[in-house]
Amino acid sequence: PGVLVQPDFYRYTATIDVNTRNPRGNPRRGGQYALRYQRYDDTGRDLFSFDRVDIDLQQYVPLVRDRRVLALRARAIMTDPDSGAEVPFYFQPTLGGPDDLRGFRHFRFRDRNTLLFQAEYRWEIFTAVDGALFYDIGKVAPRRQDFHLSEFERDFGIGFRFGTANGVFLRIEGAFGSAAGAHFILRFGNVF
């Protein structure tokens, strides 16, 4: 769907975002809790109309006077097509790449629904350099009922973050766990 026929959409969005992260650019405590609902209405033949719900929950637990942080994230994206309609492949959520399942190539997994959990242990090495150990687990599925913990993809790794309290400007990571081998990540900005 969406390859041979390019539909036009009306898109409606409602968002709730509560942000208590402190500091916001490189959080050491607090959290961010976001819920977004989107409605895509196919303006033509109504073959690709669907609803989408994104839930992104992040929590930062300070340890040892904010020099060490446990960063946790849970994210779910669920799409629900209208009866007889489909979600175009380019609107289907994906997993894989430097911001979610880091041990897998970009867009490695794609389907109508995704579920992702991430945990990072971050510690200050020097004033502008942090170390990070991370573990990611996630899955895509055609139906929400198909999420079984034993079938989730997993990865882990280590990295370094360069930045200030205002934000991370560079992130270097090594991610492991996929059959494709190790992945080296050089990225501007924080993962979450």
Report residues per predicted region.
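Hydrophobic alpha-helical segments
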Residues: F126-A128, A132, V140, F162-V168, ...
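Short leucine-rich amphipathic alpha-helices used at interfaces
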Residues: D99, F117-Q118, D146, V168, ...
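C-terminal outer-membrane beta-barrel translocator/porin domains of Gram-negative envelope proteins
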Residues: P1-F126, L133-I137, A141-P142
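A short, acidic, flexible beta-alpha connecting loop/helix-capping segment that sits on the rim
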Residues: G174-A180
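A short alpha/beta connector and helix-capping loop motif
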Residues: D146-G159, R171
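Short active-site-adjacent structural elements
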Residues: A141-R144, A180-H183
